[in-house]
UniProtKB/Swiss-Prot annotation:
Gene Ontology cellular component list: cytosol
Organism, as annotated: Citrobacter koseri (strain ATCC BAA-895 / CDC 4225-83 / SGSC4696)
Cofactor entry: Mg(2+)
Protein name: Phosphoglucosamine mutase
Family: Belongs to the phosphohexose mutase family.
Catalyzed chemical reaction(s): alpha-D-glucosamine 1-phosphate = D-glucosamine 6-phosphate
UniProt function note: Catalyzes the conversion of glucosamine-6-phosphate to glucosamine-1-phosphate.
Binding, Mg(2+): 102, 241, 243, 245
Intrachain S-S bonds: none
Gene: glmM
Length: 445
């Protein structure tokens, strides 16, 4: 188990202006990354960002650090995270860097690296970068300094890639779609992908101003999308998050369709088309209704820890191709190397068109179990509530009452002193009562 100082499970992230998301830190990060990556070769680095105002500052700092280490940088401008992974592969770049805090508010930002094959940097490379950051910055000889350039048609290349994941024999001509781009990195891409495939597109969340990313729009807040779908009498809505690696959908009645349901639709269609290899990977938070629906289809299902990184690891371990979190991270390894909201959405649209079915009807084969989540704050020095005898006893009582038609999950937050209590089962009133019973036991510790 590595003991890294800066890199978390999803790169480096924080509030802009507070360590580590400061200009001096990011400059040194660029230099350290440049020193380490230069050992592997002298190819350029691709840098993409979302629409946060801080992206300008941070990409300049990164580029300066890389140049001092002798590596050149190519900027994509605002670009979805999965697009940077794709461009890194196609340009055979030494690495890709994304400046984004995904679904977080504008005042946060982060930095994530992709390796030459469009996957996460190996742990040992991240550790080498951290080790380099302990040293003083040195500059290569002036004749060896890196340069900066801009990739002229980055968006066009990625649009064509996305369209290429949609079956050639199908068209979206019959569909009216509302797409919500979260005022984020997909604002100039997702509407064009859908239009070029023939859809009648109404775009919202496509007016980024640097500070409105994810603000009451996008995959984390679909209320505006739900209202617009109903007002426009659209066939469906598609919501992406700030960096385009998540997708949540809305059916023609305004019902939310989450990552579990999206994976169910894609897995079932893959089975029908004879293209599903193995099973599907969800997380500890995936709805039990997904597990049961896949079981009825004969599709194996495995749960990973929460986090798209762990979903990907489980897929690689099993040799399977499809995984998802209910938050909307959908990973389709036969199409791409990372979660891609646009590509996942297109596979659902293909299932709709091919089967002449609405999104609502495609979801009907999966019954979502009521799932109640209660967050309980505890005193940091009061011991581990999960080891408390009374908490264990109450949890065991609830599990016995639910039997094999429900689940209980207690887990600690990774960032604050919270216990997350999740209970799911067939009866919402019962599940709610059980969740609060366990939460009360945790509070009493």
């Amino acid at each position: 188990m590595s003991n890294r100082k800066y890199f978390g499970t999803d790169g480096i992230r924080g509030r802009v202006g507070d360590a580590p998301i400061t200009p001096d830190f990011v400059l040194k990060l660029g230099w350290a990354a440049g020193k380490v990556l230069a050992r592997h070769g002298s190819r350029k680095i691709i840098i993409g960002k979302d629409t946060r105002i801080s992206g300008y500052m941070l990409e300049s700092a990164l580029e300066a650090g890389l140049a001092a280490a002798g590596l050149s940088a190519s900027f994509t401008g605002p670009m979805p995270t999965p697009a940077v992974a794709y461009l890194t592969r196609t340009f055979r770049a030494e690495a890709g860097i994304v400046i984004s805090a995904s679904h977080n508010p504008f005042y946060d930002n982060g930095i994530k690296f992709f390796s030459i094959d469009g996957t996460k940097l190996p742990d040992e490379v991240e550790e080498a970068i951290e080790a380099e950051m302990e040293k003083e910055i040195t500059c290569v000889d002036s004749s060896e300094l890196g340069k900066a350039s801009r990739i002229v048609d980055a968006a066009g290349r990625y649009i064509e890639f996305c369209k290429g994941t949609f079956p050639n024999e199908l068209s979206l001509n019959e569909l009216k779609i509302v797409v919500d781009c979260a005022n984020g990195a997909t604002y100039h891409i997702a509407p064009n992908v859908l239009r070029e495939l023939g859809a009648n597109v109404i775009a919202i969340g496509c007016e980024p101003n640097g500070v409105n990313i994810n603000e009451e729009v996008g995959a984390t807040d679909v209320r505006a999308l739900q209202a617009r779908v109903i007002a426009e009498k659209a066939d469906l809505g598609i919501a992406l998050d700030g960096d385009g690696d998540r997708v949540i959908m809305v059916d023609h009645e305004g019902n939310k369709v989450d990552g579990d349901q999206i994976m169910y639709i894609i897995a079932r269609e893959g089975l029908r088309q004879g293209q599903l290899r193995g099973g599907a990977v969800g997380t500890l938070m995936s709805n039990m209704g997904l597990e049961l629906a896949l079981k009825q289809l004969g599709i194996p299902f495995a749960r990973a820890k929460v986090g798209d990184r762990y979903v990907l690891e489980k897929l690689q371990e099993k040799g399977w191709r499809i995984g998802a979190e209910n938050s909307g991270h959908v990973i389709l390894l036969d199409k791409t190397t990372t979660g891609d909201g646009i590509v996942a959405g297109l596979q659902v649209l293909a299932a709709m068109v091919r089967n002449h079915m609405s999104l609502h009807d495609l979801c009907s084969g999966m019954k979502m179990f009521p799932q109640i989540l209660v967050n309980v704050r505890y005193a940091a020095g009061s011991g581990d509530p999960l080891e408390n005898d009374n908490v264990k006893a109450v949890t065991a009582e609830v599990e016995a009452a639910l039997g094999n038609r429900g689940r209980v999950l207690l887990r600690k937050s990774g960032t604050e002193p919270l216990i997350r209590v999740m209970v799911e089962g067939e009866d919402e009133a019962q599940v709610t009562e059980f969740a609060h019973r366990i939460a009360d036991a945790v509070k009493a510790v």
